[in-house]
Amino acid sequence: MKAMPWNWTCLLSHLLVVGMGSSTLLPRQPPQLSQKPSFVTFRGEPAEGFNHLVVDERTGHIYLGAVNRIYKLSSDLKVLVTHQTGPDEDNPKCYPPRIVQTCNEPLASTNNVNKMLLIDYKENRLIACGSLYQGICKLLRLEDLFKLGEPFHKKEHYLSGVNESGSVFGVIVSYSNFDDKLFIATAVDGKPEYFPTISSRKLTKNSEADGMFAYVFHDEFVASMIKIPSDTFTVIPDFDIYYVYGFSSGNFVYFLTLQPEMVSPPGSTTKEQVYTSKLVRLCKEDTAFNSYVEVPIGCERNGVEYRLLQAAYLSKAGAVLGRTLGVRPDDDLLFTVFSKGQKRKMKSLDESALCIFILKQINDRIKDRLQSCYRGEGTLDLAWLKVKDIPCSSALLTIDDNFCGLDMNAPLGVSEMVRGIPVFTEDRDRMTSVIAYVYKNHSLAFVGTKSGKLKKIRVDGPKGNALQYETVQVVDSGPVLRDMAFSKDHEQLYIMSERQLTRVPVESCGQYRSCGECLGSGDPHCGWCVLHNTCTRKERCERSREPRRFASEMKQCVRLTVHPNNISVSQYNVLLVLETYNVPELSAGVNCTFEDLSEMDGLVIGNQIQCYSPAAKEVPRIITENGDHHVVQLQLKSKETGMTFASTSFVFYNCSVHNSCLSCVESPYRCHWCKYRHVCTHDPNTCSFQEGRVKLPEDCPQLLRVDKILVPVEVIKPITLKAKNLPQPQSGQRGYECILNIQGIEQRVPALRFNSSSVQCQNTSYSYEGMEINNLPVELTVVWNGHFNIDNPAQNKVYLYKCGAMRESCGLCLKADPDFECGWCQSPGQCTLRQHCPAHESRWLELSGANSKCTNPRITEIIPVTGPREGGTKVTIRGENLGLEFRDIASHVKVAGVECSPLVDGYIPAEQIVCEMGEAKPSQHAGFVEICVAVCRPEFMARSSQLYYFMTLTLADLKPNRGPMSGGTQVTITGTNLNAGSNVVVMFGSQPCLFHRRSPSYIICNTTSSEEVLDMKVTVQVDRARIRQDLVFQYVEDPTIVRIEPEWSIVSGNTPIAVWGTHLDLIQNPQIRAKHGGKEHINICEVLNATEMTCQAPALALGPDHQSDLTERPEEFGFILDNVQSLLILNKTNFTYYPNPVFEAFSPSGILELKPGTPIILKGKNLIPPVAGGNVKLNYTVLVGEKPCTVTVSDVQLLCESPNLIGRHKVMARVGGMEYSPGMVYIAPDSPLSLPAIVSIAVAGGLLIIFIVAVLIAYKRKSRESDLTLKRLQMQMDNLESRVALECKEAFAELQTDIHELTSDLDGAGIPFLDYRTYTMRVLFPGIEDHPVLRDLEVPGYRQERVEKGLKLFAQLINNKVFLLSFIRTLESQRSFSMRDRGNVASLIMTVLQSKLEYATDVLKQLLADLIDKNLESKNHPKLLLRRTESVAEKMLTNWFTFLLYKFLKECAGEPLFSLFCAIKQQMEKGPIDAITGEARYSLSEDKLIRQQIEYKTLVLSCVSPDNVNSPEVPVKILNCDTITQVKEKILDAIFKNVPCSHRPKAADMDLEWRQGSGARMILQDEDITTKIENDWKRLNTVAHYQVPDGSVVALVSKQVTAYNAVNNSTVSRTSASKYENMIRYTGSPDSLRSRTPMITPDLESGVKLWHLVKNHEHGDQKEGDRGSKMVSEIYLTRLLATKGTLQKFVDDLFETIFSTAHRGSALPLAIKYMFDFLDEQADKHGIHDPHVRHTWKSNCLPLRFWVNMIKNPQFVFDIHKNSITDACLSVVAQTFMDSCSTSEHRLGKDSPSNKLLYAKDIPSYKNWVERYYSDIGKMPAISDQDMNAYLAEQSRMHMNEFNTMSALSEIFSYVGKYSEEILGPLDHDDQCGKQKLAYKLEQVITLMSLDS
């Protein structure tokens, strides 16, 4: 159904409402209103998104701007009125919109996005601006949203066609007696000609007035607006200014913006667009926008830059924050939210910061900038508005705080960023909005976040830090939008997301349950209402003004102490006294409660309250089995409020739970031990005897610590124990016993108490099971009277032991602990005690006995059994009786007949010997191991049963044979006998390969890192044997990761990720990693080839308390590629984890019943990740039973086409690393069709056949129309083809004829070389005409003598090498010493040292050597050396060549350079050149090529010379399409052919006079009253416009202003003088350092645009006929080839001259050879032998540093004028020159830039010239220092007096003044400087130069 136009919809709605008698418009279905626990939420229509929000400060009503609707809501978010604004038929390309005039573009139903919503309080109306119809606005009555007006018929009514809600901001400025103003700032979406980016408009009282939204001021020249120039879009095609916030304060209006940087910041290597945030300021009363100033803003914390503005809000400082910041409480503060970095992406970084700016400080910074600019310092610095820097103009005037600018020095930019004060940062949940206010002197900020949370922040928190005191989840999904608003009473906050509007209280005091929590929360709204025991605002607490009723500080909280604070559970009704603090007056009474145990009245006496402990009947509930005490809360309850208002802990303790004396008396409570009753009690009077009471631990009966108690098994022995305070059993009590718990069996032994300090367990034998334990610790307990334990605090144990257990050999027996007294009984051959060995039958050996050596040593094992013949193998020998000391075996070991030296470290007495093999003889092959213990007698000798073999090891191969430089490759080396020996070392060259494992046929090792790409020889060392084979391992450059896709996964991981990079095939076990929450998660990857691999995203392990709907970003994300560290963390990716899909169960029963063929629907959420950019899907697999089904996915459901099954089957969904079963599905079988169903099917089939026949008839008719259309298109294609052929034919003909003509034209032209001084000044100080070094130093007379004396002394210091080097190094180390300063100092030093070039060269060499050292130390690539001009040394090098190559330029290289310049100029002028765009028919630059067929003729005019009327007429070739200015310039070139440019008259100063017959004369001009204007386009006058015929006579006459053209001239001069100074050619001799595009900018005020040959590319309003004449624009690229061919000879000639060692009779300048030799010496010194590096150094040093500068800027050498098209062509030649010097290979394709493709075939031959040139120079004999010094002295002498040395020294000294302390520091501390007293001398200079002296 076609959508109904919105105006008809409104009309019908209105009629319905009137019919129902209602007075308000209501939506058809009331939007949902939902109530959260404490939040009220409003949700609109499902298809609507909310855009803007504003609250009426007078009524509290809310106005909500949404897509297609405006709502008026009550303060509790109930809908009062709605007003529909869309959708409607529109097309963004319709300008003016279709409601004004018919639009040819196709129309479609278009939503109306609300872009601006403002309340005009003065006129009681709402201004609502949308995106429809190029951004028109409605004015609605606040009461009922009745439309008061909707102006749309003028272009001022179209604000902007941008379809984004956050792109427009408006500020209303109110006046009491005049109409208000509306300042509007908007993005323009690439249409700067239609919409100003910032403007001020009229707000008329009458909403339907004609002047509504008209510019406040608008005349022919000036208007209250600023447009973005079209030139800005040529630099950055998608440039726009995004306005984030706006406000008015004082006399100014401010806007905060986000806009692309015109110039990338230093160090930026990426092509990604960099953005900057700026504050824009305008005077409220400024109608011409001369007060426009913009300042960059940002903030930084802990080294992190936050530069992307997200939101802002203006508030006051408040008293507390004001004191911290040093401002008044009512001063304006700007609260801002920035995100990290400067790159604005769809996926902005989550790191963000809340920063504050003091508005007064920003204004002070602007005032400083205005003052400096009006002193003539710096440039206007507004790159987007003034593409070329315009210098500030000086003017004597006073600039105060309210200065509003003049028509000079405006608009103005501030280059230095104003840094805000960062008060809070958030790393994970990006902040997106901010609002702030002051509450009771505290400054509070409320911040919305990306995940829908609200952060409440106290900016003036404790210790000067911001305090985030609460976080609230407000929005269900999505971020909080920028617009937030307070309710009328500031007690509620309205928070908006795209789908909901929520009301949130500014405070939630009620959530805090205690005074400490309440006052410790940091929320200044909250205090403690004491007797109500609640946290609330003060005004909500009853009688809060009375003393101590309301606590607002922690120290005011109620505190209690109770005496006593504990009692025994056996005590009842004890009087307790409570001391109270901070308690209010309690006249109504108070109760004491012990939790729920008991409650009684309290007696209030002053600040004391008396209560009684619970009665006897209530105490049993307190006694517990756990522990000896129970804590209850003793609470005070107010009888006035019935609320508990204070409490303290009270302890009931129970002594009777203790069953030992020590635990009893060491209890913290009043417990006593009754020694004779063996009980613990709180009442000592219950003990039987007075002497039996124990209170101190030292009085307890207890065993004392004894040494180890050793008891051999089966030996009868008593155990004596030391003790103290042992009680004497009383009558009727039993005696003492010892209890030993042996392997779980209790053994009781009678004990005898000798006295109170000794007890003995009687004689008994003990035993335990098993021979695998040689000693067993046993618990020992002493008891009396049957069960009264004696405390054993030392934990004494008895150790039972068996000598024979685990000591089967003599050696092991004698190794036993000597305290065991074990020995070896030889006859039975076992380990026993002496008494168990029969003395008459056997010998008993003990360790301490004489000759106690064990006989019969035995070897059981040797490891290894093979080894290399060279020795060094560590052999491990294991066995029995292998000696008891190392000396026993130290020299008695042989292996296979070879001495093996035992090692002390490996020796284990009696059990193991480790020895190192000596070298074997060739005749030795194998043998046994033989040892002697102490002496080599048979009974002390042993021989192994195993043989030890000597092996020869060989290597065969290694795989893989290449790996990354970082190492980590697992390499397998194959060979024979590789398991021999004990120690293996594998080396790849000098790099170890870490041994992993081996077998007889292979060794596996892991490579370590290498610092360079090299082939390494493989060496294996086994013990002392080195094995070599011709095996080579190749270290290759590390893999790189170029791109991964997608950059997201779900939390459960296993999402497939494609990875592209280089050298990926080197990696054996690639893995992907993500670190989150401190834990690393890894998954596998599979390499496909060298450039591709696939990975499975790692899963994240999130905790159970994690919110499942949150997006996660890992702290680290990267790849584990063997040992490549650089890819462990990928900095350039923002890998994101989205929530896992969540499925719902089919039903509570888990069974879904379906018919066959019915799709199965699985409902859930997060089924499609919310990835920016949209179209992404997860790979779902759904199984029904075992069969998969076809799946269709949407946001909230999976639709599964059920397979051909019947019956009950389980459904399983799998995605990523998770699977889920929503339940079972039951598919019932089909029933057979009934008769009615069959009839229905037959009827439907018949209807279908009829329909198909009708479609076929329609198709036949349509195809006939298509054939006719095809024929028409064929004819048009034929016409186009013929035009293309003609163009190609013309280009070929031009190529053949132009070369001859050009060569003949250039013959004999004089070369206007600049003199040496002018030439050097243009290179050293570009753009500065009258530099101080060209004139005498100007000093007031009274200071002249001292200054000259000081400068002479300073000159001596400059001529001191130690000082000069220290001076330069110190300056370069200063952060504020800019690149411009470095170049300036280098040039000034060279001018001072012009007369001492030998010394200058020596200093330069030293600085270059230092630069090379620094470059290599910082690990930069050597090729980067001298690439840029970032140091004094590099600029000095440029200047050095400038001085020394002047002669070579004049005698040799200047001629081909001038010829090339003239050739380009003449060739360009042979064809049309567009005076507006600078494009030409003939060009080398694609950017400056006219891509259209321009019809033109060549005319020859006869020109009368302006200097001599009687001289012969000069024939001049011109084109009939030339503008009058172009004709004048060609005539001047012809007349003054050999005259330098600076000596010619200017075309602007001359008029062109056409002299017709009969003395008639006519002045021709670019613009006059005959100029044609069509559809806002004004075409410049051409020769054809005036119909000047071939052969006409013209004359150049001096400029005259006549009545005829006065109006026109004044127009041009007024425009030029005000807004467009930067676009007029200035008359200074050096034309420009950059190319200038000739432009005459469209007249912004009148809307008229100028054109010459082609209309500007940005304008889309060319007629169809214009388009038809264009053809395919790329066809005209053949003209580039034609031009290139014409100029080829001149390019070749120049390149050949520069790259020849001897040419045109001139020898190679000595400077070149000398400097190249110096670079070679430095390369040798640092071991750099890579020829590419040396080649690059030389290229960076001379061709790219000097020659490219000369080629691009021939005006540095010649007195010429360079126009923009010539500049563009020279840039192409210079780029070719640079490419020729490069060593890298240029890979070109069809998408490569045309200038690269143009010379692609020539560059290889040019590269050969360069290489030959460098090679020839290298072969030339070296220049001695004497010869070079003589040459330099001669150069110094020739140009000695070119510069004023005193002036140059004075300029250098200005840097001493700026950095005096920093320069003096190193001079004081350096020994060499100290010896020469350089610091003292410099201080003398400073004294002499100071103004005070």
Curated annotation (Swiss-Prot):
Q: Any idea where the IPT/TIG domain is?
A: 857-951, 953-1036, 1039-1138, 1141-1229
Tissue expression notes: Expressed in the developing nervous system. Widely expressed in both the central and peripheral nervous systems. Expressed in the peripheral ganglia, somatosensory, olfactory, visual, auditory and equilibrium systems.
Q: Which InterPro entries match?
A: Ig-like_fold (IPR013783), Ig_E-set (IPR014756), IPT_dom (IPR002909), Plexin (IPR031148), Plexin_cytoplasmic_RasGAP_dom (IPR013548), Plexin_RBD (IPR046800), Plexin_repeat (IPR002165), PSI (IPR016201)
GO MF annotations, alphabetized? semaphorin receptor activity
Under the heading SUPFAM superfamilies, the entry gives: E set domains (SSF81296), GTPase activation domain, GAP (SSF48350), Plexin repeat (SSF103575), Sema domain (SSF101912)
**Glycosylation, residue list:** 654, 1006, 1131, 1179
Q: List the disulfide bonds.
A: 94-103, 129-137, 283-404, 299-355, 373-392, 509-526, 515-557, 518-535, 529-541, 592-611
Q: Which organism is it from?
A: Mus musculus (Mouse)
Which residues are reported to carry the modification N6-acetyllysine? 1349
List the SMART domains hit by this protein, alphabetically: IPT (SM00429), PSI (SM00423), Sema (SM00630)
| UniProt domain Sema: residue ranges | 24-506
**Know the name of this protein?**
Plexin-A4
